[in-house]
Amino acid sequence: MSVRSLAPNSLWNHFADLNAVPRPSKKEERVIEFMMNFGKELGLETTKDSIGNVIIKKPGSLGMEDKKTVILQSHLDMVHQKNGDTTFDFDRQGISMRVNGDWVDADGTTLGADNGIGVATIMATLSSKDIVHPPLEALFTIDEETGMTGAKEMDGSLFSGEILLNLDTEDDDELSIGCAGGIDTNTSYTCQSIATPDNYSFIQINIKGLLGGHSGMDIDSGRGNANKWMARILWNISKKSNLLIGSLDGGGLRNAIPREAKSIIAVPSAELKNVQTELEEQAKVLHGEYKSIEPNIQITFSATESMLEVISEKDTNKILNTLCCVHTGVFRMSPDIAGLVETSSSLARVLVENKEFTTQSLQRSSVESTKDEIAMTIRCSFESMGCNVTQTGDYPGWQPNPNSDILTIMEQLYKDLYNEDPQVKACHAGLECGILGTHLPNADMISFGPNIRAAHSPDEKVQISSVQKFWNFYLETLKAIPSK
C-alpha cells in the first residue's frame, strides 16, 4: 500500500510531496522554495521573512470571516539520522516511506513525521476549498531541530492572529500547554599526544543497536546513552590495564539520545587477553542491566591497525573520569505536574580526534533557575578537567496557562468527540511556543498532534489511525474558533 492512498488523502499526499524534498536543518533552501511555490500557486499571500520562515495567509471561509485569526505553525526542517548499515544521502534523496499495518515509517532513516505531518496538515488546509476555517496565518519555521533560529528571529509584526495552534505534539490524546527551555553546552580540550609505546596492541570497540530517541521526550525512558556506556567500559578497562585512547566517536545530533559509539584504544600486548575478557564482562553486565529496555544491544570488539600516536595516559584518564562524572538523564522531576520531567541533560556528542577532545550536550528545564543550575553543573564538570566551555542557544520555556480560552474550547471538543478527557500536559521538549510567545505576547497558544514514536531516530513512525483522529479534531477546532 502507498502512503498516497491513505486517509485523509490530501494530508498524506502533501506529506509525500514534502518528504520528496531534502530538508535538513541549516539547509532548508529547497523546502523554502517548495513552500513559497506552493503558496503562490494557490494564489495566496505568500512571503518569506528575513531569516527564511515562510508565511502564507488565507482569508476565512464563507461565514467565518469575522472569527479570530488563527496562526497555524509547524517547522520545515527534520532530523536526519540513519542506521549505521543504511546507505542514504539526505542531501540528495527523498525519504523512502513504508506502510506497516497501522504505521508509516521509513527504510532505515528518520521519517520526518516530526514535524512534516504538521506541515502537511496546514498545507491540506490552505489548499482546500471546502474546509470550514477562520482567517489563517500559516507560519512555517526553519531550523527548529538545531537551534530554533526561525522562531527566535521571526517578526511578530507580520501577524495579527490571536490564537496559535502548534502542530508539533506527539500523542493524540494530549493538549500541550507548556514546554521546557534549553541551552547547549559545547566543550573542547587539546590533549597531549604521545608516540605509541612499543609492544602495544590496538582494539576497536563498537556499540550499536540502542534505541536512541528524543533527548527530551524520551529522557525518562531509561534508554542507554552510547557515549556514557563507552566511557564506562573504557574506565573499567583502564583500572586493570594501561589503556590509552586512540580515538573516540559517539553520538550525532545535539537533541538525540546517542545510539552508537566507537573507539580505538591501545593496551599493552601482554595484557590483551585480560582486556578482551574485561570487554566481554562489561558487555555482559550492560546486557543484563538493559535487557528489558534495549533489546538490540550490540557491543563488539576486534583487533585493528596501529596508530602512530595516542592520547597520553594523563589526558586519557581526564577524559574518562570527566565523561563518567558528567550528568546525563533526568536531573529533577516536576514537583507540581505528575510524571513531568522538569530538568535534564543529555551528553549527545563525544569526539576525540587529532588530539582534540570535544563534546556537545543539551540541558533542558521548564524552570529557568533550575536550567541555570544544570547548565552550571555540566560546565563545572568539564571545566574541572581544563576544558574550554561555551554555552549557547539559550531559549525560554513556555509557561502553562490553565485558564487559556483555546484550551477550554479544545478540552470540551475532545470530550464531545471521544467521550473522555484529553491529557492536558506540559512537555519536556523545546517546542517553539516558548520562543514564539516572546514575539506574540498576546497569542493564546496550544500544541497538539498525532501519535509519533521514536522521533529523531531511524525507528521513527507515525500512526495512521491517529493521524485521522488528529485531523478530525483539528477540523472541529477550526470550526469552533470564536468571533473577534
Give, region by region, the residue ranges found by the protein language model:
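Midchain, well-structured core segments that form catalytic/ion-binding scaffolds
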Residues: 102-105, 145-146, 152-364
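Active-site metal-coordination/substrate-binding segment of hydrolases
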Residues: 64-135, 140-146, 151-155, 161-162, ...
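Active-site-adjacent substrate-binding region
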Residues: 218, 225-227, 232-248, 400-443
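Acidic/His- and Gly-rich active-site-bordering loop/insert found
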Residues: 2-102
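His/Asp/Glu-rich mid-to-C-terminal helical/loop segments that flank catalytic regions of hydrolases
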Residues: 157, 223-240, 269-272, 318-324, ...
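Substrate-recognition/cap regions that form aromatic- and gly/pro-loop-enriched pockets
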Residues: 340-429
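Acidic, glycine-rich active-site loops and adjacent beta-strand->loop/helix elements
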Residues: 76-78, 139-147, 169-172, 211, ...
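Zn-dependent metallopeptidase/amidohydrolase metal-coordination segment
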Residues: 11, 335, 342-355, 362, ...
